[in-house]
């Protein structure tokens, strides 16, 4: 629950044994906690159904996909708090799953990568649980995609590809509650000055993507911290 709102989730199991809730040989299952992409505005658990099913089958993990609320009906921080609430329920054992709490990985793509990174920052701040691993797939981590962006990938790849710099600015405007949100590290995780005590992290970027350089920069800063 996020307040009075029950956050919907969808579960994917790698086997019938996992679905039955019985640990195999006494061992519980690793879990991928997945936040989908879509600019905080589009997409859904249903749109990522096949992706999550394949992840469960190919990795042997239980996959938990979160149906967080979307902008513009729900602005920052509502989608983030929905994701945090789902993560807290999983990490604190409130969900009846044969899940190993020491083998939970938070994963998300694009806006979902933003939410995954922000959930880890928020978890460190609140101290209610702490993820051990995160996978950020071409994450959206910055707060500016105009000509003022310091990242070369925004200038080089901001036009002519599926995701444009103009689209990213549109998504940010729809997600923010006010322009002040753009200075909040939970809105744009790359703004966080202290990246110590964060989970082990894998970041995947795409060469011809405006998000490329911010993902690589975030990875280097995590490594240095």
State the predicted function of each range.
Residues 4-225:
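Alpha/beta-hydrolase superfamily serine-hydrolase fold, recognizing
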């Amino acid at each position: 629950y996020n307040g009075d709102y029950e956050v919907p989730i969808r579960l994917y199991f790698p086997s019938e044994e996992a679905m039955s809730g019985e640990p195999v040989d006494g061992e519980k299952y690793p879990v991928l906690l997945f936040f989908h992409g879509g600019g905080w505005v589009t997409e859904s658990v249903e749109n990522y159904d096949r992706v999550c099913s394949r992840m469960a089958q190919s990795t042997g993990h239980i996959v938990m996909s979160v149906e967080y609320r979307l902008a513009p009906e729900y602005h920052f921080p509502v989608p983030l708090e929905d994701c945090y609430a789902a993560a807290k329920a999983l990490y604190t054992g409130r969900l009846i799953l044969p899940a190993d709490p020491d083998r939970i990985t938070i994963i998300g793509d694009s806006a979902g990568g933003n939410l995954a990174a922000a959930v880890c920052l928020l978890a460190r701040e609140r101290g209610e649980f702490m993820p051990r691993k995160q996978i950020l797939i071409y994450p959206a981590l910055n707060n500016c995609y105009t000509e003022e962006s310091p990242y070369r990938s925004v200038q080089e790849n901001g036009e002519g590809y599926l995701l444009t710099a103009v689209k990213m600015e549109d998504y940010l405007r729809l997600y923010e509650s006010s322009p002040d949100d753009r200075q909040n590290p939970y809105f744009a995780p790359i703004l966080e000055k202290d990246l110590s005590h964060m989970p082990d992290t894998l970041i995947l970027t795409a060469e011809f993507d405006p998000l490329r350089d911010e993902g690589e920069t975030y990875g280097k800063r995590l490594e240095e911290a």
